[in-house]
């Protein structure tokens, strides 16, 4: 028997794949230039072609609040179950949240 690997990107075969039309290494420039202010709600949307500043797969699709900035990356507060987590994510993996946030 072969031992099961437990790397950082395990179980991401479908999660970290792009649509055929979206393939390519370079993200849109507008995506990289997007600025977020403290208190903004954002969705963590992992871009698999950019490995820098990529959060763990468990945070994909979660809504968080911008707490601040660290270099080019943002400090995001995310609720995971009953705990609050603080993660550092680059803007390539963030999108503005357009829905209504209760709370």
From Swiss-Prot:
GO terms for molecular function: structural constituent of ribosome. It comes from the Archaea. Pfam families: Ribosomal_L21e. Keywords: Ribonucleoprotein, Ribosomal protein. One of its GO terms (cellular component) is ribonucleoprotein complex. Belongs to the eukaryotic ribosomal protein eL21 family. HAMAP family: Ribosomal_eL21. This is Large ribosomal subunit protein eL21.
């Amino acid at each position: 028997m072969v031992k099961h690997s437990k790397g950082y990107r395990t179980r991401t075969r479908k999660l970290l794949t792009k649509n055929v039309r979206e393939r390519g290494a370079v993200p849109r420039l507008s995506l990289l230039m997007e600025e977020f202010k403290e208190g903004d709600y954002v969705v963590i949307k992992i871009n698999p072609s950019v490995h820098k500043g990529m959060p763990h797969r468990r945070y994909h699709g979660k809504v968080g609040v911008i707490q601040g900035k660290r270099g080019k990356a943002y400090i995001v507060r995310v609720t995971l179950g009953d705990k609050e987590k603080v993660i550092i994510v680059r803007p390539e993996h963030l999108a503005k949240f357009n829905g209504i946030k209760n709370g």
